[in-house]
Amino acid sequence: MKRTMLYLSLLAVSCSVSAAKYPVLTESSPEKAGFNVERLNQMDRWISQQVDAGYPGVNLLIIKDNQIVYRKAWGAAKKYDGSVLMAQPVKATTGTLYDLASNTKMYATNFALQKLMSEGKLHPDDLIAKYISGFADSPNDTIKGKNTLRISDLLHHSGGFPADPQYPNKAVAGALYSQDKGQTLEMIKRTPLEYQPGSKHIYSDVDYMLLGFIVESVTGQPLDRYVEESIYRPLGLTHTVFNPLLKGFKPQQIAATELNGNTRDGVIHFPNIRTSTHWGQVHDEKAFYSMGGVSGHAGLFSNTGDIAVLMQTMLNGGGYGDVQLFSAETVKMFTTSSKEDATFGLGWRVNGNATMTPTFGTLASPQTYGHTGWTGTVTVIDPVNHMAIVMLSNKPHSPVADPQKNPNMFESGQLPIATYGWVVDQVYAALKQK
């Protein structure tokens, strides 16, 4: 009931408020923003050491009080060709595009849902079956409940779906195998629930694959076209896209990821698997093979400058400059912690307890929210300190440490920088020791 009343409130506000003038980002210096420059220099040196130790490339940008106060790039956008180190790596720049991985969930799907809900075209309590035809339990399903699933259940990751059904891998997916977008939706409908909906929170890509399909159902447009035309273009963002190689970008503008396709250095095999270095194509297997590069859970590419505008839009309460995407009430609803688990908002992860330290560090306010991405991306938005941090990297662009023991652990993932919270803490420490 409270959620419904909040929704009605935000809808009333969004209908009565015309495009307002919101703060836009300007450039400033760390000193003027109150940062201890020596502490930031120490962080700079440490990141350089991590790159020297094998971490491929990093971009970091800091916003404080509507100003970009720090922006820097380290390392390489591409330094391997297959398993061979390049004689002349492609350097990372502050304009390099990165595969956002699961940050796609926030800066594509959540932004779309927040906009559509502000416009009254969606409701958090709407049933999934309202938008996805044929979404229902199968007679042989052990756990029932698909007919009761709401949009908010998917946003809270409490819908009952498994974390990763691996649809494109026939040996793992079995009868749920799909490497075709239309067929993938049918396979998602057939995917059995693993727990009773609403009984707990289990982070699942399937939730956001479904949410992406819902955005397409409501708008009548492919997800990428809708967000690029209705969200990014009005904000003046030209470097935030799905399938960048199909939209005018060159590989040299993009950070490469896994060295030998999706094979984890030769130990993973399935039909049509890529075997050459990912450079401009989404790394995520479900997004690439099962969804054609455009999915609600992964597939978006961007750079720190564009992400900064999107984070500032959240700090502003839903708008940027003369553009209003959604209302402040919508932002509040989406970033409020779930009663069952303080670390889950509606899609956004919230700094609700110490389990989020690897993401938000130890110094961010409890109201801080953001997300991470498997490729080495993290976004941190702190409305209390009116600050935001984005770190983009290409963590999988390194050899797998031990393919037989753990094919998902890359050598770069064993370095301290792979725990984003350390970098976040250094930013906060520099602010507190001004």
UniProtKB/Swiss-Prot annotation:
GO terms for molecular function: serine-type D-Ala-D-Ala carboxypeptidase activity. Keywords: Carboxypeptidase, Cell inner membrane, Cell membrane, Hydrolase, Membrane, Protease, Transmembrane, Transmembrane helix. The chain crosses the membrane at residues 7-25. InterPro entries: Beta-lactam-related (IPR001466), Beta-lactam/transpept-like (IPR012338), Diverse_Enzym_Activities (IPR050789), Pept_S12_YfeW/YbbE-like (IPR022849). Gene3D superfamilies: DD-peptidase/beta-lactamase superfamily (3.40.710.10). It holds the Pfam family Beta-lactamase. It comes from the Bacteria. Disulfide bonds: none annotated. SUPFAM superfamilies: beta-lactamase/transpeptidase-like (SSF56601). One of its GO terms (biological process) is proteolysis. It catalyses: Preferential cleavage: (Ac)2-L-Lys-D-Ala-|-D-Ala. Also transpeptidation of peptidyl-alanyl moieties that are N-acyl substituents of D-alanine. It is a single-pass membrane protein. The keyword Chloroplast does not apply. Its EC number is 3.4.16.4. GO terms for cellular component: plasma membrane. It is found in: Cell inner membrane. PANTHER family: BETA-LACTAMASE-RELATED, BETA-LACTAMASE-RELATED DOMAIN-CONTAINING PROTEIN. Belongs to the peptidase S12 family. YfeW subfamily. This is Putative D-alanyl-D-alanine carboxypeptidase.
